[in-house]
Amino acid sequence: MTPVLEAGVLPAMQELHVSNDILDNRVALEAAWERDGYWFFRGVLDTEAVERLRSKFLDEIAQLGVIAPGDPIARYSGKSLSEFPFRMEPLAARKIWKPFVAEPAIHRFFTRLLADEPFWIPTVEYRATPPAQDRSRPRFDYVHQDGFYNAGIPFLICWIPLAEIDADVGGLVLAEGLHKGPYLHDLSQPPLFPIPDGAVPANAWRRTTYRPGDVVIMHLNTPHTGVANYSDRFRLSMDIRVMATSGNTPIVGNITSITQREVAVQGEDGRSGTFTLDESTYSRGLDGGKVPLDEIPMRFHPGDEVILASREGRVTVLRPPH
C-alpha cells in the first residue's frame, strides 16, 4: 500500500518509538537501530543549551522583520518572503553549530550515546521554515535518503527541534525499517535522482510532536522528509551529522589543487592527500545534485571548504559543507 499524498493533507501515521529506556543498553540500542533505522530520545538534550541555540535563530529572523523582536513563539509577521534566506545562509556563515556541540551537556550526551568521542561532520541544515504560502501541493517536501548522496561517509543524522513542532507546524517524518533495502532513488532522473511518489509504503511513515530537548538520530539510508508548515509561526530546527571518532571519518578541510582527474585536500585535523576523481564520484553541488565529472574543476576551486570521503585512494564523495 502506498500513500496518496493529497494537497494539504498529512497522511495518518504511527508515533516514533521512544528509546530513552535503552540509552545505556548497547545490545538493545543496536537491535532497535537494526529494526527501525532510527532512535528517538525525549528530553535528553540540555534545554538551556537548546534555548541558547534557538535564540540565535530568533535574533536572525527578527532582524529580517518576519517576526516581532523578542517573540518567543516566532509568529510570522506577514512581511514578504521574497528575500528571505530559506537556507539560513547567515547562520551557516557563523557556524553556530560549533558552540552548540561544544556545550558540555551536549558533548556528554553524544559521547554517552556513541560510546566514543563524537566526530562532527559540518553538513548542517538550519531550518527557520515559514508558514507555507502555497497550500495546493502535498505536504511532504522532498523524500530522500542521505546515504545516496554521501557514499562512503557512514554518519548518523541528528535532527534537533528547537521549539514545539506539532502536525500543523510540520517537522520531520521518517520511514521506519526501510534503511535495510536498496536505495529508492530513481537513477534515471539526474541530477537529483528523486525517490518516486509511492515508493515508500504508507504504513512505514512515523512522526510525533517534537519538543525542545528531543533528538532524532537516523540511519543515513532511512527515507525521510520535512513536512510543509501549516501553522502561523516559523518552524525552527537544526540537523547535523555525527560519527564516532574511531570510525572511518571523512576529511574535512580545504582544497589545495583540483583537476578533472584528481583533487588534493588539507584537512583541519592534519590529514591530507591527493585523491582520484572518476565517474563514480558523487560530487555534490549546493543544490544536492551530482556535478558531472568534467564540470568539477569549474564548480570547486583551491581554498574551498569541502568534505571528502575516499576508498582506496578514489573519491566517493566530494561536497561543500552546506
Regions found by a protein language model. Give the residues of each.
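Non-heme Fe(II)-dependent double-stranded beta-helix
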Residues: T2-D36, R42-H144, Y149
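Non-heme Fe(II)/2-oxoglutarate
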Residues: T2-S19, Q63-D71, L187-S188, V215-I217, ...
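Short edge-strand/loop segments of extracellular domains
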Residues: P131, A175-P182, R235, R241-S246
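Short, conserved beta-strand element in jelly-roll/cupin
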Residues: Y149-A167, T209, I240-A244
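Double-stranded beta-helix
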Residues: I165-T225
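Short, basic/aromatic beta-hairpin or loop at an interaction surface
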Residues: H185-P196, G273-D287
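Short, flexible, surface-exposed loop segments at domain boundaries
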Residues: N248-T274, L286-H322
